[in-house]
A protein has these predicted regions:
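Active-site-adjacent betaalpha module
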Residues: 1-32, 76-81, 93, 103-225
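Acidic-leg catalytic submotif of subtilisin-like serine proteases
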Residues: 31-46
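Active-site loop/turn elements of alpha/beta-hydrolase fold enzymes
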Residues: 38, 90, 188
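Short, flexible, mixed-charge acidic loops at enzyme active sites
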Residues: 44-52, 100-102
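A short acidic, glycine-rich active-site loop
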Residues: 55-69, 107-115
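A short, N-terminal amphipathic alpha-helix
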Residues: 65-84
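Catalytic-core segment of enzymes that process non-peptidic bonds
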Residues: 87-90, 95
Length: 225
């Protein structure tokens, strides 16, 4: 059962069946793990979302921290196989000219370089050999050297986790597929503030763009390389 099953109407299910949506794309042999914005601004505190929203207005709360916990073994598996582990951070150098999220009221200082909010959560912090790419917009490809790095590393597949599902994760996955990478989103390692956004984004990615797999399937894939 997929996380989006409870939002589908009978007509939706028939459209998917008759239209042939959601067929597996498959994964290649040279993957990288791409962790989208696993930083304090978006993870927030390990509490129910409403209990931490005043301190972390963009934070997802406890569901993000459950994803972080599951990510530990996946990150370790990639490192053991000597496959690339890449992180992105949403970070602004100058809030007046940098950044895109103008539709939410936020404290600009949380998004400036040097604030705790821009730091990757300590539980899954990068190690020597991992790469961290700073970005200012939703897609990890926009205005960053990510594509050049992936080409240099001869990566053919991206295993994507992080947040938020309906924002930066979705934008990055669509751009990755548009650049001819095989892509899988790890369903239980992505997170969003809004349950509906999370489910609809995963449904849309699964239907039209990339594979959506569990952390167990992702672990099995990388350990078999």
């Amino acid at each position: 059962m997929s996380v989006w099953d409870d939002i589908l109407t009978p007509t939706d299910r028939e459209v998917i069946r008759r239209g042939g949506y959601g067929k597996p794309r498959g994964l290649g042999e040279r993957p990288a793990l791409l962790l989208i914005d696993p930083q304090y601004n978006y993870a927030g505190a390990d509490k129910p979302i409403l209990d931490q929203i005043q301190e972390w207005p963009s934070g997802v709360g406890e569901s993000a921290w459950r994803a972080v916990e599951r990510l530990k073994s996946l990150i370790q598996a990639f490192r053991e196989k000597k496959r690339p582990v890449l992180y992105t951070r949403q970070v602004q150098k100058n809030i007046a000219f940098d950044g895109f999220a103008a539709k939410a009221v936020r404290s600009s200082s949380q998004y400036l370089e040097g604030s705790k909010g821009t730091s990757i959560v300590e539980d899954i912090a990068p190690r020597e050999g991992d790469l961290v790419i700073d970005k200012s917009y939703a897609s990890a490809f926009y205005g960053t050297p990510l594509l050049s790095i992936l080409i240099k590393l001869k990566v053919d597949t991206l295993i994507v986790a992080g947040g938020t599902t309906g924002g930066c994760v979705r934008a990055t996955c669509v751009d990755a597929v548009s650049r001819n990478f095989d892509v899988a989103v790890v369903e239980d390692c992505v997170f969003d503030r809004i349950s509906a956004s999370h489910k609809v984004a995963l449904l849309d990615l699964w239907m039209k763009y990339c594979d959506v797999i569990s952390s167990y399937a992702a672990l099995d894939y990388v350990t078999r390389l």
